[in-house]
Amino acid sequence: MKKIIIGNWKMNKTVSETRDFIQKFDIFYQENVGKIKEDLDFAIAPSFISLSLISKSLTKKLEIAAQNLSQFDSGAFTGEISGKMLQDLGTKYVIIGHSERREIFKEKDEELKNKILQAQKYDLIPVFCVGESLLEFEAGLTKKVIISQINAIKSVLNFQKAIIAYEPIWAIGTGKTATAAIAEKVCGLIKENFGKNTMVIYGGSVNSKNINELVSQKSIDGALVGGASLDPEEFGKILVNS
């Protein structure tokens, strides 16, 4: 199965900072393209105001990802961005169910199901995030939590055209990374329960130093990269080491 790397910028970088990133990334990519596997897919999920800038990159393999979308199709929903709008921009992937959206914005299963339906309606590939808290991990509840989170949306998700991102909450932005063995075990569990051809990636303090060990695992098909994707050279090195 092909590997994929998706950079999630969260609420970082202005438009001018995004332009600067793209210029520097393009230079790095052109200088190192021979070191990057030809079948590696990669994308960046910037803030909504910078989405269109990703398409200006000279690196034509660089795809656009969105960090979120509305559960509604169109209408009087102030501040929302629809799947149709994202499709029109050339967006390929959309992150749904990230733990920060679940915790801070209280997104529930029904809303996540509606977002998945909207994404699929407009041919966007959902990157559906699952993950357990430190308390759940230490209590040995990882399997129960992950299976439950996917079961909650499996009736609407087309697993053949989706990506499941395993992001243990205790490893997001903490500097702690699940060992490759732990990540492999959970990603393997997802494939076991929801189909061996389901694309499963890992997220949580991924960087250029640990990416190779992670993507070398049998059940890990790539990575959702947070802070390390904000630096053009570091993001480029992640691609090289994948």
Swiss-Prot record:
It catalyses: D-glyceraldehyde 3-phosphate = dihydroxyacetone phosphate. It is an enzyme of class 5 (isomerase). Substrate binds at residues 8-10, 173, 205, 226-227. One of its GO terms (molecular function) is triose-phosphate isomerase activity. GO terms for cellular component: cytosol. It is found in: Cytoplasm. Pathway: Carbohydrate biosynthesis; gluconeogenesis; Carbohydrate degradation; glycolysis; D-glyceraldehyde 3-phosphate from glycerone phosphate: step 1/1. Its EC number is 5.3.1.1. The active site is at residues 98, 167. Keywords: Cytoplasm, Gluconeogenesis, Glycolysis, Isomerase. Signal peptide: none annotated. GO terms for biological process: gluconeogenesis; glyceraldehyde-3-phosphate biosynthetic process; glycerol catabolic process; glycolytic process. Belongs to the triosephosphate isomerase family. Homodimer. NCBIfam families: tim. Involved in the gluconeogenesis. Catalyzes stereospecifically the conversion of dihydroxyacetone phosphate (DHAP) to D-glyceraldehyde-3-phosphate (G3P). This is Triosephosphate isomerase. It comes from Mesomycoplasma hyopneumoniae. The gene is tpiA.
